[in-house]
Curated annotation (Swiss-Prot):
InterPro entries to which the protein is assigned, alphabetical: NADH-Q_OxRdtase_suN/2, ND/Mrp_TM
Gene for this chain: ndhB
Subunit structure: NDH-1 can be composed of about 15 different subunits; different subcomplexes with different compositions have been identified which probably have different functions.
EC category name: translocase
Protein name listed in UniProt: NAD(P)H-quinone oxidoreductase subunit 2
Entry keywords, A to Z: Membrane, NAD, NADP, Plastoquinone, Quinone, Thylakoid, Translocase, Transmembrane, Transmembrane helix, Transport
One Gene Ontology term from the biological process aspect of the record: photosynthesis, light reaction
Leader sequence segment: none
Source organism per UniProt: Parasynechococcus marenigrum (strain WH8102)
Pfam families: Proton_antipo_M
Compartments it resides in: Cellular thylakoid membrane
Length: 523
């Protein structure tokens, strides 16, 4: 990248020697990522001391690193916008919001994973370090403003995700999931690289801002081809139809805590990438990529929720559910308005709690029974009221039942879509929401309505509920926390929407895109 070298030489000439490092790196913008990186290194060092030492010290190290990252992100909120790595990373409020969702999803995923790792014989040090590496890549991806930083962040997240998917070495399903994820992910990376090379050839720069300016006057077939390649990569990352084929198999075969992270953290990073690159670079192709996203959203909402009806595995059901949920979030992208983008950010925050709450219940049931079949949940309320209540509330929220947090998240998305005349998306969203309520309530009915004699054999042999075993207390904290936010968060939806709206209104990228879209509409 010759232009970056020229820029660096110019910076060296203008800056005093003591100012050069700050000008080149500006570490304050990436301090949250630095906290995660230090926690990852400390975890690896502690792991060298042995499994017993790691089991004792890895959890507090992870809590400290992620907690510090969240505090630093809170301090960056509404602070002056700073860039880092010669402008390749931007720490605006939009990036802060998505990075906070990812860091919190990792923290909750770790809380629900310790007992699972202990019971399955998984080395906690390596597992936590790889998960922190995936978190680091996802957080950097949220603020990446250069094709090089986008690709490096994307690959950091992807490679760590492949390792996590296949971490259960003795489980054939886990190895199969990792292989499928690796093959499809490698193809997606190659497609993105080809699209990036076309963008670089058209603009002569790797900066997303410079590419966006160049494409304003270069709406050629080659530019349209690069849009297709980039959009395919984004669709793969958010598991949108028809780029979803990897999702059910990977979700079913991977360790459940890994699935919990992939369903939220990886998806949030994918939507952050979509905002940065589609909205930032392809403003001249606004109508084209929105049309493609409309098709993807309709297909995702329809196929994801309809196919989920036939699933017998809880993890596969939530895999198809996550495909449908991605379709709902895409409504906000297609709108391209302040309300649409804000509803998108809000729904990702809501999805964090209701989905991870559901996975916490699934992990707890799996730890106690070793089963993932939906039919084995029959009559569960008799033996474990906490799992029954928690899973019921989280599933109702995912279905959009009032007054749960998920209901208000969907309402904001549908209102934004209707105001922007996206009637097809709103109607399809409403219909598929009803479909999703059916399979969510089917699980709840099975847990609650069954008579004692109709309980599954698994539930009849259900072990005594004990929270004193190692790793169970963090799991209970995560479960109760997620369920509480899911149940009570609907009351606080207005402050949450204001938080999401601030992330959008203070983003120069989104405000410029909204202004250009409005101008084209008036023209």
């Amino acid at each position: 990248m010759p232009e970056m070298g020229v820029f660096l030489l110019a910076a060296q000439a203008m800056a005093a020697p003591g100012e050069l490092l700050n000008l080149s790196l500006n570490a304050t913008a990436v301090l949250p990522e630095g906290a995660v990186l230090l926690a990852m290194i400390a975890t690896l060092l502690v792991d060298l001391a042995g499994e017993k030492v790691a089991a004792r010290w890895v959890p507090p190290i992870c809590y400290g690193g992620l907690g510090t990252a969240l505090v630093l992100l809170a301090l960056q909120w509404n602070a002056p916008v700073e860039s880092s790595f010669l402008g390749a990373f931007l720490a605006d409020n939009l990036a802060v919001a998505f990075r906070a969702v990812i860091a919190l999803s990792t923290l909750l995923s770790l809380l629900i994973s310790w007992r699972y790792a202990e019971q399955s014989g998984t080395p906690v040090g390596e597992f936590a370090a790889i998960l922190l590496a995936a978190t680091l890549g996802a957080m950097l991806l949220c603020g990446a403003t250069d094709l090089v930083s986008v690709f490096i962040s994307l690959e950091t997240l992807s490679v760590a995700s492949y390792l996590l998917s296949g971490y259960m070495k003795r489980d054939a399903r886990s190895s199969e999931a990792a292989l499928k994820y690796l093959l499809v992910g490698s193809a997606a990376a190659a497609v993105f690289l080809y699209g990036s090379s076309l963008l670089y050839g058209l603009s002569g720069s790797t900066s997303l801002e410079a590419i966006g300016v160049a494409l304003q006057t270069s709406t050629t077939p080659v530019a349209a081809l690069s849009l297709v390649f980039v959009l395919a990569t984004v669709a793969f990352k958010i598991a949108a139809v028809p780029f979803h084929q990897w999702t059910p198999d990977v979700y079913e075969g991977s360790p459940t805590p890994v699935v919990a992270f992939l369903s939220v953290g990886s998806k949030a990073a994918g939507f952050a990438l979509a905002l940065r690159i589609l909205v930032g670079c392809f403003g001249a192709f606004d109508g084209q990529w929105k049309l493609l996203f409309t098709v993807l959203a309709v297909l995702s909402m329809t196929l994801g929720n309809v196919v989920a009806l036939a699933q017998t595995s809880m993890k596969r059901m939530l895999a198809y559910s996550s495909i449908g949920q991605a379709g709902f979030v895409m409504i906000g992208m297609v709108c391209g308005t302040e309300d649409g983008f804000a509803a998108m950010v809000l729904y990702m925050a809501a999805y964090l709690f209701m989905n991870l709450g559901a996975f916490a219940c699934i992990i707890l049931f799996s730890i106690r029974t070793g089963s993932d079949r939906i039919s084995d949940y029959a009559g569960l309320y008799q033996k474990d009221p906490l799992i029954t209540l928690g899973l019921s509330l989280c599933l109702l929220s995912l279905g959009g039942i009032p007054p749960m947090l998920g209901f208000f998240g969907k309402i904001y998305l549908f209102f934004a879509g209707w105001a922007d005349h996206q009637y097809l998306l709103v109607v399809v969203g409403l219909i598929t929401s009803v479909v999703s309520i059916y399979y969510y309530i089917s699980v709840i009915k099975m847990m609650v309505v069954k008579e004692p004699q109709e309980a599954s054999d698994i539930v009849k042999a259900y072990p005594d509920v004990s929270w004193s075993v190692m790793g169970m207390q963090p799991l209970r904290v995560a479960l109760i926390g997620c369920v509480a936010v899911t149940a009570v968060g609907g009351i606080l939806s207005n402050p949450l929407f204001q938080w999401a709206n601030t992330a959008v209104t203070s983003s120069p990228l989104l405000q410029e895109a909204i202004a250009q879209s409005t101008q084209r509409g008036l023209g």
